[in-house]
């Protein structure tokens, strides 16, 4: 009987020494139910411990990096309106069929393009077939005035002139009309470019390929 009592007591002591369910502290990308489950300054976002965008921590940076097109990694981050955006100094390599995202830009004065086009310090009509390229593809202005060939997934293609940079380094200010920095794989086209490709600009972003014309 004494042995049974000792066994029960030993089992009881073992059980109370275990941490309660959910009390384990998770590090980057570990499971969580609330911020108390996460280590240090990490917070619980969609069931995983991650950096707090409002605090601006980068504890989890590089822990499980999302793959970037062409191996071009972010050079930093820019926080605007409480949301963190990656910045880039580079873009994927240009090929005879470079994958990209086509977005829509208003190149006229007062439009969402912000200031005048960088290539010629002028505003442009949206009836022109013109584009802005991500910082890496803009390449310090070396493609200014040059024509590129854009092909949509519907098979249609159009030639357009490079007149501006879609800034991947800066944003969220008056110069950029409050827009966040561009991703590193953007071809920002005028209304005329979208129309020539038979695309609805209200879609916002579509997959394309492009090359030098």
Curated annotation (Swiss-Prot):
It comes from the Eukaryota. The modification 4-hydroxyproline is found at residues 65, 67. Undergoes proteolytic cleavage by actinidin to produce kissper and KiTH. Three forms of KiTH are produced by cleavage at different sites. Residues 1-24 form the signal peptide. Keywords: Allergen, Disulfide bond, Hydroxylation, Secreted, Signal. Residues 93-107 have a biased composition (Polar residues). It is found in: Secreted. Residues 91-121 are annotated as: Disordered. The keyword Acyltransferase does not apply. Disulfide bonds join 28-60, 32-44, 38-49, 72-90, 80-172, 119-144, 166-182. The keyword Signal applies. Coiled coil: none annotated. GO terms for cellular component: extracellular region. Its main location: secreted. Belongs to the kiwellin family. Kissper is an anion-selective pore-forming peptide. This is Kiwellin. It comes from Actinidia chinensis var. chinensis (Chinese soft-hair kiwi). The gene is KWL1.
């Amino acid at each position: 009987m004494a042995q049974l009592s000792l066994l029960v007591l030993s089992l009881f002591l073992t059980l109370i020494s275990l941490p309660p369910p959910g009390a384990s502290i998770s590090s980057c990308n570990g499971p969580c139910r609330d911020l108390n489950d996460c280590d240090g300054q990490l917070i619980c976002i969609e069931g995983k411990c991650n950096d707090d965008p409002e605090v601006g921590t980068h504890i989890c940076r590089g822990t499980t990096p999302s793959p970037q097109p062409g191996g071009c990694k972010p050079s930093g981050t820019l926080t605007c309106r409480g949301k963190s955006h990656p910045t880039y100094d580079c873009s994927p390599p240009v090929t005879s069929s470079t994958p990209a995202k086509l977005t829509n830009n208003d190149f006229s004065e007062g439009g969402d393009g912000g200031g005048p086009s960088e290539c010629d310090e002028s505003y442009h009509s949206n009836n022109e077939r013109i584009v802005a390229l991500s910082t890496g593809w803009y390449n310090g202005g070396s493609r200014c005035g040059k024509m590129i060939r854009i092909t949509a997934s519907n098979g249609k293609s159009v030639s357009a002139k490079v007149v501006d940079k879609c800034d991947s380094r800066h944003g969220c200010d008056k110069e950029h009309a409050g827009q966040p920095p561009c991703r590193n794989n953007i071809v920002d086209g005028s209304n005329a470019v979208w129309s020539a490709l038979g695309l609805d600009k209200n879609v916002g972003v579509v997959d394309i390929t492009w090359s030098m014309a």
